[in-house]
Amino acid sequence: MQTRSWRAVGRAALVCGLSAASLFATEARAETPAERGYRLLSTKAYLAPDFDQEVFDQLWMTWEEPLRSEAEAAGADERRRMAFSRYGLTEAPGRPGPVALQYVDDGRGGWVISCLACHAGKVAGQVIPGLPNSLFALETLTEEVRETKLRLEKPLVRMDLASLGMPLGGSNGTTNAVMFGVLLMAYRDADLNVHRDRPQPEMTHHDHDAPPLWNVKRKKNLYIDGFAPRGHRPLMQFLLEPRNGPERFREWEDEFRDVEAWIESLEAPRYPWAIDIGLAAAGEATFHRVCADCHGTYGPTGRYPERRVPIDESAPIACGSTR
């Protein structure tokens, strides 16, 4: 009797195990577009690598004193932590390997920059994809990568060379990203064919803070002047390095529809600390009175007015103005 009972338990366990295996297989097959978009963004190398692991591991040798001596005396793990802190990099939750979340491993030890370089940040120790990376030091990182490559006699690549004549960002957390797009598009025709003989375009260099991506779904247009309609194609502009021809963009278009789905799936993270309800209510009333006309409102019924406000430098228009 006892033997039959244990056999029944065994059969039940086997059935449960097979059911669980089937469930996990179904879940794997049923990856949503948003999940697929984030997976692609965080694991697929769309560009050539900017540097390799050897270069990254030796960046500390370019640092000023006393930081360089502190790094020299530290172990490899502590030097890595110091480098992540210096350049505004974070660990990649759930992704194995030494490469920071802001980059993708090309499978040969190369670090390939991704959209998450500017669009994955950290607050109070928590890594949040979609949060502006207010700590990213692209200019400093690129300068020190170039110096390290020259010492190691490694070849320079597009980022190392382009940054000699073009500012990448004047402060941590900001980049000259709009001009990156202007420069890359200048050498393409309407069919995205590359024309290397074209002159360099006139550019107005200026730094931008990256926006929080969970607000994108509220907008019809992107950027401060709303000149680009929201969609998956504007997301692809930073892939326009010359080695990526028109056929690559046709191949990748559906993948960036998934990336857009990920962006539109994002919600603002909940504030983790205590809230002064009275003060928040007073702030909400002030925000609706003074700011909401231009900046929109939040919550389940939130709206974004998509206003383009002309700015006369001699008489700037304040938020809430009816002019």
Where are these regions (language model features)?
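Electrostatic cytochrome c docking/interface patches
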Residues: 93-106, 261-287, 296-311, 315-316
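Glycine-rich, acidic and aromatic/proline-enriched surface loops and short helix-turn segments
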Residues: 215-219, 252-265
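N-terminal secretory signal peptides that target proteins for export/translocation
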Residues: 1-8
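The canonical Cys-X-X-Cys-His
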Residues: 112-122, 213, 259, 283-298
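Boundary at the C-terminal end of the N-terminal hydrophobic targeting segment
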Residues: 25-30
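Bacterial N-terminal signal peptides
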Residues: 11-22
